[in-house]
Regions:
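C-terminal signal-anchor/stop-transfer transmembrane helix together with its immediate cytosolic
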Residues: 254-296
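Acidic, S/T/G-rich, low-cysteine, solvent-exposed domains in lumenal/extracellular/periplasmic regions
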Residues: 1-241
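Intrinsically disordered or highly flexible coil/loop and linker segments, enriched in small
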Residues: 55, 174, 238-245, 279-282, ...
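Juxtamembrane amphipathic/hinge helix adjacent to a transmembrane helix
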Residues: 230, 234-260
Length: 296
C-alpha cells in the first residue's frame, strides 16, 4: 500500500524508531534498559526509495538535560543532568522547513544514510559536530547521566536525523509479476520526509492532560518540535504561502556606528538646544502678532 501510494504521487512523513529503547524500564527503580533493533520489515522499501535507517544510536554533547532525584526521601532534590541520548538537533536554515526554527528535541535517535538514485534528497536536520555513534545491543544506565562526560569520545561529526526526498520513486515491485493489471504505469512525483525518532511528536502528560508539543515539564524548557513538524506538513501539502510568510525576513536598518560616534557631540547639543531655539522663535512670532493686533 505504501509503495503504490507513493507511486501515485502521495506525499508522506515517516517518524520511525530503528532502535527500540524501553523507557518504562529505564525510568523504573532499576534505572537500566537494553537497546535492540526494531524490525519493521521496511528496510527493502526504504532502500528502494533512496535512504537507510541505521540501527545505531546517536549521542550528542549538545543535548537536552534530564532531571533526576538526588538524596533520600524528604531531603531529595531534583537536578538536571546532561543526557547525550537526547540530541538537540539543528534544522537546515537554508530550507523553508527549517528556516528560523530553533533546536528540536530528539530522544534515542538513529543516523540516516542517503543512497544514490534519481530522487532529490535534502538533509532537514542534523546532530551537532560533537556526536558519537553507539552500536546495539547496548546497556543504557540512567546513573551514567551523573558521571563526567568525556568530550574526546564524541568524534563522529554531524549525523543526519531527518531527510526530505522529492521526485519520482521507483517501486519495490518493479519487474515483478503483478496479481492484477495496474491502471497507470506512469510514476507521479511525490514528496517524502523521514525522521529517525518516533518520539518527535510525542506530548508530555501532566495531570492526565497533554502538554504543548515541544514543552518539557521537568526542565520548563520549550523546544521547536511543534513548529518544525508544522513546517514539514505544510511543505508536504505544498502550502507555500505559510512557509514563505514564516521565512520572510525583516531587515532592520542599523545606524552607522563609526559615524554615530564621530557626530555624537553635535547631535547631543542639537537635541539640547534645538527645541529651545524653536520655542524662542515661536514666542517671538506670537508676541509680534499680538503687538501688531494691539496697534490696529
Amino acid at each position: 500500500i505504501l509503495d503504490q501510494y507513493t507511486q501515485q504521487g502521495g506525499n508522506s512523513m515517516y517518524l520511525i524508531d530503528p532502535v527500540h529503547v524501553q523507557k518504562d524500564s529505564l525510568y523504573a527503580l532499576s534505572g537500566t534498559t537494553v537497546s535492540y533493533g526494531n524490525a519493521l520489515e521496511l528496510d527493502d522499501l526504504f532502500f528502494k526509495f533512496g535512504f537507510r535507517l541505521r540501527q545505531e544510536l546517536v549521542k550528542d554533547l549538545y543535548s537536552a538535560p534530564i532531571v533526576l532525584a538526588q538524596g533520600q526521601q524528604n531531603t531529595s532534590q531534583y537536578l538536571p543532568y546532561p543526557w547525550p541520548y537526547n540530541p538537540l538537533a539543528a534544522p537546515n536554515q537554508d530550507h523553508p522547513i527549517g528556516s528560523a526554527v530553533g533546536s528540536v528535541h530528539f530522544q534515542f535517535a538513529s543516523p540516516i544514510d542517503t543512497l544514490k538514485n534519481k530522487v532529490k534528497k535534502t538533509v532537514l536536520i542534523q546532530s551537532s559536530s560533537l556526536s558519537k555513534i553507539e552500536g546495539i545491543p547496548s546497556l543504557i544506565n540512567l546513573s551514567s547521566a551523573t558521571e563526567p562526560i568525556k568530550p574526546s569520545l564524541f568524534t563522529d561529526s554531524k549525523q543526519t536525523l531527518g531527510v526530505l526526498l522529492e521526485g519520482r520513486f521507483n517501486s519495490l515491485y518493479t519487474n515483478r509479476i503483478h496479481p492484477f493489471e495496474w491502471k497507470s504505469k506512469e510514476i507521479q512525483p511525490a514528496r517524502m520526509a523521514i525522521f529517525s525518532d518516533g518520539n518527535l511528536l510525542e506530548n508530555q502528560i501532566d495531570k492526565g492532560q497533554p502538554l504543548e508539543l515541544g514543552y518539557d515539564k521537568w526542565t520548563n524548557n520549550f523546544y521547536s518540535n511543534k513548529q518544525f513538524l508544522k513546517n514539514t506538513i505544510h511543505y508536504l501539502i505544498e502550502d507555500n504561502r505559510f512557509l514563505s510568510l514564516r521565512a520572510k525576513e525583516i531587515k532592520i536598518a542599523l545606524l552607522d556606528t563609526a559615524k554615530t560616534e564621530s557626530e555624537l557631540l553635535y547631535w547631543r547639543y542639537f537635541g539640547l538646544f534645538a527645541p529651545l531655539l524653536i520655542l524662542l522663535i515661536l514666542g517671538l512670532i506670537f508676541n509680534g502678532y499680538r503687538l501688531k493686533s494691539y496697534r490696529q
